[in-house]
Amino acid sequence: MSPSSVKRVWMYWTKTKMLLSIKKFGRKNKILDEESVELILEVNKEQNLGARRLEKIIEFQHGKHIPHNAIHKVLLHHGLANVNRNKSKRRKPWVRYERKHSLSLVHLDWHDGKFNGKKVCAVLDDSSRCILAGGEFDAETTENSISLIQEALDNFGWLTSISQAMTDHGTQFYANKRDKNGDADSRFENFLEKNKIKHIKARVKHPQSNGKFEKWNDTYEKNRYRFDNFDNFVNWYNTIRFHESLDTKWYLQTPDIAFWARLPEGCKLKMFLDRMETELNVGDRI
């Protein structure tokens, strides 16, 4: 305590014979109006994310700034968040790597789903984090893996072919028994080669190589129960949920928006010409 504070307390005591009350430091707690509380609950129901993330989304979508601490209190009050006393206040520096263009690299992986006991696999675009194809299966098989790549090609191959596919060394993707030349008869690898897709194998015992897919698995486990089927979940993930890894300084993005925005320029030109041709054909028929 500074000498001036001691003097002030002493002078107050000599005049009033009472202790000087100490005011609370910091800002007063902000009391949110009912409209703000309803907005927080509405956006949380749609996005199912934490307070720090909801703060950015609410400001981006609705132009209204609500501090994340106030949002967290609302979530706690409604049983939508937990108190985490061990959470670090300082976030670690975050470095990410991603491809510049959509369809230049996709990730595949199998996951044991806890929601319904199914085996889950998807084709995830590296640049946009968009799910290009996926499903819940009874077994992890090479046939199912191939069918998902084929589905992605059927849906988006008219734009441009997938350049590369990254997987782990699972038997669904890779034949571990090889001859002296390093060759093996793997149906999945043969399928990729036939479609001119380069197969990239993630480093063994190095989960960071497929970290984007691990993040998607986590999102699946936290949100799958909210949807009647897998397709509805993927539609929410692709088109409604703002993905933090896609944030820019000026705007937020869903994987679907990022996918179309990050296509190579040649693909965008092709889309424009195809649309012009369609409109001209419609005009000729009229």
Predicted regions located by residue number:
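RNase H-like two-metal-ion nuclease catalytic core shared by retroviral integrases
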Residues: 167-169, 178-222, 253-254
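Basic, flexible linker segments flanking DNA-binding modules
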Residues: 19-105, 183-189, 255-258
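C-terminal domain-tail junction helix/linker
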Residues: 218-286
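Key DNA-contact positions within bacterial/archaeal DNA-binding proteins
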Residues: 4-8, 69
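Mobile-element integrase/transposase regions
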Residues: 64, 69, 76-124, 128-130, ...
